[in-house]
Amino acid sequence: MAFRRIFLPLIVFSILVFDPIYGQKFELDSNYVEETPELFSLRFYFSKKYTDLIQKTADGNTYRFQPNSGNNLGIGFTYQKLTLNLAMPVGFLNPDRQQDWPLYLDLQAHLYPKNMIIDVFGQFYNGYSIPSDFLSNSDSPYLREDIKLRKLGLNFNYLFNGEQLSLMAAFNQSFIQKRSAFSPFVGFEVYGGSIKGDSLLLPAFENQRESNFSSNRSFQVGPNAGFAGTVVFGGGFFLTGVFSGNLSLAYTQWNESSDLDQWGIVPTYFLRGFFGYNSRKFSINANYVLKNNQMVRLDNFD
């Protein structure tokens, strides 16, 4: 692991950023980070978010289930400790989306207080497909409007050098990183989710009887550690990277059967990168976030 055309917009991306440590004193190092609380920032952006399910079968084939999401067009603003971004998929950016499939909702909050990294996920996808590139016996995508995925998660980390390294500067430009800085961090994460269809999920024409399933539930929790850093160059350009690895105690159940469940330890990782240019009047950047969640292996299920 991981619409019927209507006139009301579908909100698929929402971020609310605030500093929850109101009662604590945390001073930034002004030699490294410039705080700009008086500025009101307005942004226009493109985004693409999705949660895939990747199933590896006993004979070595790989099937990738992809949701009926798409390319989003959005607007947002930042003022002091509040950031709000709203976006939706628009038709001219998504000519291949299934227009009559159910609505979906993908809520992600990426919070960067001055010495913390917090990620919250609430994903509710309806309708998945397997592209033809992942099918051995078909030249057309395999469409399943009935497949539903639900995923909830929390990732929390403490940034040791938060007074010199601001991830807010890379993410929403409410701060400006003036000099390069780096920091290790430690924390924990917890995730739970399910995927279910009205019948077996893999197509019958693929002949994967032993590795086929109609539902899956999973849960995992464990500690993680990582490293973050920003390199500043060229009078305002920056390159930020954040990577963490995790070992989680995990549980997976297939086909709602107590005979097909398993506890185990699984490795996961979280990768994000930011590149752009920041100033008090203008900012442009590109962001990439990838969260990998593994399931416990069980016989023919991987």
Question: Which sequence ranges carry the predicted segments?
Answer:
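Extracellular loop and loop/strand-boundary signature of outer-membrane beta-barrel proteins
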Residues: 58-63, 91-95, 104, 137-145, ...
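Predominantly the C-terminal beta-signal and adjacent terminal strand-loop region
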Residues: 269-302
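Transmembrane beta-barrel strands of outer-membrane/channel proteins
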Residues: 42-50, 77, 86-90, 111, ...
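Outer-envelope beta-barrel architecture signal
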Residues: 36-42, 71, 80-82, 114-118, ...
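Outer-membrane pore/translocation modules
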Residues: 29, 108-216
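Surface-exposed strand-loop-strand hairpins of Gram-negative outer-membrane beta-barrel proteins
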Residues: 49-72, 83-99
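Residues on the lipid-exposed face of transmembrane beta-strands in outer-membrane beta-barrel proteins
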Residues: 44, 73-79, 107-113, 154-160, ...
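Residues that define the transmembrane beta-barrel architecture of outer-membrane proteins
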Residues: 38-40, 67-73, 78, 101-105, ...
